[in-house]
A protein has these predicted regions:
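Nucleotide-activated sugar donor-binding and catalytic core shared by glycosyltransferases
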Residues: 1-185
Length: 185
């Protein structure tokens, strides 16, 4: 089950990474065909990424984010880490229909990305379920970078880093994140 769930999440990102690489040859990291391997996932789970010519790198997530121009990131703490680094990205999340329906009924939050939850608005585009596909993700990336430089929206995401650091800096980060999530439940 977990391997199938993981593959469902990975497929649109792998396809978009390969497709965007052809358009943005000068970009680094994701557009150099790399994906940060998630801790706890074995290399076999990334067979789909390799099939699409995407290199999987383990233990270097922060380095990849720091070197990247743009990112496609599955929802979770990695989205907050990317936002704090100042990496413009799209939050991607796809799971089984049953899991999605259960989560939607149980968790009543306006956003799934930690940066969006913390700032209380859609600062980073979230693509969930049927909206998380290659064509849409490629369009979203184009709203952040035009192939030569960041767009207005891309620069806005880069500046979100300061706002998030301000929010998290007033308390211990984990308490601040937990309080913000509880407020939004």
């Amino acid at each position: 089950f977990l391997k199938d769930h993981f593959t469902v999440k990975l497929e649109p990102m792998a396809k978009t990474s390969r497709r965007s690489h052809a358009k943005f040859l000068k970009m680094r990291s994701l557009f150099a065909g790399k994906i940060a391997g998630a801790p706890g996932q074995d290399a076999e789970a990334y067979a789909l990424a390799k099939k699409h010519g995407v290199q999987v790198v383990f233990g270097e997530t922060r380095v990849l984010m720091q070197q990247a121009t743009l990112g496609l990131i599955a929802s979770g703490t990695a989205t907050l880490e990317a936002a704090l680094i100042g990496l413009p990205h799209i939050i991607c999340y796809r799971t089984s229909a049953l899991t999605y329906l259960l989560a939607k009924r149980l968790a009543r939050v306006s956003y799934i990305g930690l940066p969006n939850i913390l700032i209380g608005k859609m600062g980073i585009q979230e693509r969930i379920q049927k909206d998380c596909h290659e064509d849409q993700l490629a369009k979203d990336l184009n709203t952040l970078h035009d192939g030569q430089s960041y767009t207005k929206k891309g620069w806005e995401q880069k500046r979100m880093s300061d706002e998030l650091k301000s929010i998290l800096g007033t308390q211990k980060a984990s308490k601040s994140v937990a309080a913000s999530i509880l407020e939004n439940l």
